[in-house]
């Protein structure tokens, strides 16, 4: 079992699956230079007391400690600790004592981003808990130019939503929210205005699923749907699920969630003074823009392919994948017969840009990921150009082809039964995959024979 040490915001792990490969994760949440140490102990009387005694004997200042049952060994508990940065000179001997004298399993990590390192990535859906609260902006705090910056009631409300997201853990139902009348009015304005455009501007997949969301998830002008209801609906359609988040995540963390068919979703709504504008993703953007397409099997698979491609990818490729995501999932157009329709959530949740993108003003180019990945884009204005996909299936194959160019010493696949990402870097893993494929092919052949007869 791997152990984890986090020092000065840099986390890296040796993965037994990668031989001598090392992985790292950069994280700026720990600004005081403290060292984070994760270790596991057998569930027995006095086990933690031995560790605390070891720290005391070596004059180590323990500033924070959390515990939880181990997800890998039901007979152990995991402890997450912060140690004073002055611990560094004796850290090696402490880890040795934890292992040899106390019998702890220490999650050991390299503390440098070295050559041939692989960025850390979640291997289980539960590990999304590790970074879900490491938001880059907004959350409970607002920039001075935010429409709600000077509104103390709105800021307090945002803190309530942020607290829900911070306290959420995988497997829990998403807490239900009683939205205010003002919030419902804001939603109603956005809902009514956008719905009028969908029939002529949105893609078939969006228009096909939208009535089902109205029927089963409470998508109405006078009602803001609950994330838990929508998440349950998504799981029955494509296996995607929603997870509340307080604000913007890093590209690596956000894309990593997609690999597990998890969409990090905001629960708050934009400020009522500007119902047709938001400087950040809000529940209008998430539910009206993203959710209908995540309910489509082909689009869900396409989105997951982007997420899987991001796992263990170098930083420069994360930037490319984030750009691909921007020009597809957020601002993508697709062919539909002789017409072009919008499928990007940024378009489907913006009244102005949804009209603009299908006018003669922007430039339209075919989706070529090698070029798309390097294209600059604006986050404050309408896009000067959009990329047009032939179909979601075609876009999915292009993502797979692009993923093959990413320099990483392994391939990955998602196992929906265990909700784990499997690293395919040895013959045993490949044999398991081959057996799985063989079983599926057998089912296919059997079904074809019955259809013919």
UniProtKB/Swiss-Prot annotation:
Regulation: N-terminal region of PAH is thought to contain allosteric binding sites for phenylalanine and to constitute an 'inhibitory' domain that regulates the activity of a catalytic domain in the C-terminal portion of the molecule.
One GO molecular-function entry: amino acid binding
PTM annotation (N-acetylalanine): residues: 2
Residues reported to bind Fe cation: 285, 290, 330
PTM-bearing positions, type Phosphoserine: 16
CDD domains (UniProt xref): ACT_PAH, eu_PheOH
Similarity comment: family membership: Belongs to the biopterin-dependent aromatic amino acid hydroxylase family.
Designated name of the protein: Phenylalanine-4-hydroxylase
Cofactor(s) demanded: Fe(2+)
Pathway: Amino-acid degradation; L-phenylalanine degradation; acetoacetate and fumarate from L-phenylalanine: step 1/6
Reaction(s) catalysed by this chain's protein: (6R)-L-erythro-5,6,7,8-tetrahydrobiopterin + L-phenylalanine + O2 = (4aS,6R)-4a-hydroxy-L-erythro-5,6,7,8-tetrahydrobiopterin + L-tyrosine
GO biological process, one term: L-phenylalanine catabolic process
PTM comment, free text: Phosphorylation at Ser-16 increases basal activity and facilitates activation by the substrate phenylalanine.
Keywords noted in UniProt: Acetylation, Allosteric enzyme, Iron, Metal-binding, Monooxygenase, Oxidoreductase, Phenylalanine catabolism, Phosphoprotein
Taxon lineage: Eukaryota, Metazoa, Chordata, Craniata, Vertebrata
Domain ACT: 36-114
Assembly behavior: Homodimer and homotetramer.
